[in-house]
């Protein structure tokens, strides 16, 4: 029963994320993406450095997103974090990613619940595949991620400036805590 309720809540939340575009009729500025993502290089662990969190991620500590290509071309994703504190209970979510734009590999649909695929865009990726920003056209959620649990203040400030330039409300941005 709890699982069914969670699926229902996730579905309603994702529908709510798109309702502004559906019902208001306004179309946000397009979200730019990187020119090309080498998916094999992108796979692996990414530590969430800062985020405008979804309801599932609120109060998350040690958040790590892991990507692995599956034989069918989809991307098996594992999102792991501790709920409430650094030593809190471990939570694991396993959405599936689907590359929507094969020319760039930078626009994905991320599916937590069938058949809904949430907008997921790689809007920044450094040349060494060590830091990335994932955004959404609706600008409701964003993730600054890195291959390491911490980054320099200079890099952090630069990434936050990029998020700001994309039109996000920085008041909602939360820095993640890692051990």
Regions found by a protein language model. Name each.
Residues 7-14:
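Bacterial N-terminal signal peptides
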Residues 17-179:
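A beta-rich soluble binding module of mature secreted/lumenal proteins
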Residues 1-4:
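Positively charged n-region of N-terminal signal peptides that target proteins for export
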């Amino acid at each position: 029963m709890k699982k069914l309720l969670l699926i229902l809540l996730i579905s309603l939340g994702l529908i709510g994320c798109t309702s502004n575009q559906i019902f208001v009729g306004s179309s946000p500025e397009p979200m730019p993406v990187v020119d090309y993502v080498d998916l094999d290089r992108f796979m692996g662990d990414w530590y969430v450095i800062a985020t405008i969190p979804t309801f599932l991620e609120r109060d998350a500590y040690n958040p790590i997103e892991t990507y692995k290509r599956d034989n069918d071309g989809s991307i098996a994703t594992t999102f792991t974090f501790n709920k409430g504190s650094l030593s809190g209970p471990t939570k694991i979510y396993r959405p599936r990613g689907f590359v929507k734009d094969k020319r760039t590999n930078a626009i994905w649909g991320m599916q937590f619940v069938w058949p809904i695929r949430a907008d997921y865009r790689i809007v920044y990726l450094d040349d060494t595949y060590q830091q990335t920003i994932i955004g959404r056209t609706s600008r409701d959620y964003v993730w600054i991620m890195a291959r390491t649990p911490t980054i320099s203040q200079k890099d952090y400030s630069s990434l936050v400036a990029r998020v700001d330039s994309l039109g996000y409300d920085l008041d909602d941005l939360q820095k993640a805590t890692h051990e």
